Amino acid sequence: DCLPGWSVYEGRCYKVFNQKTWKAAEKFC
């Protein structure tokens, strides 16, 4: 389970980012 406002993608949690910043989101997590 992820924190509110986060999404699960391939078993990982992501905050809502623009598609351009998904790479940054991966690094953040």
From Swiss-Prot:
It comes from Echis multisquamatus. Multactivase, a carinactivase-like calcium-dependent prothrombin activator, activates prothrombin via recognition of the calcium ion bound conformation of its gamma-carboxyglutamic acid (GLA) domain, and the subsequent conversion of prothrombin to active thrombin is catalyzed by the catalytic subunit. This is Snaclec multactivase regulatory subunit. Heterodimer of a metalloproteinase subunit and a regulatory subunit comprising two homologous polypeptides disulfide-linked. Residues 1-29 form the C-type lectin domain. Its main location: secreted. Disulfide bonds join 2-13. Keywords: Blood coagulation cascade activating toxin, Calcium, Cell adhesion impairing toxin, Disulfide bond, Hemostasis impairing toxin, Prothrombin activator, Secreted, Toxin. GO terms for cellular component: extracellular region. GO terms for molecular function: peptidase activator activity; toxin activity.
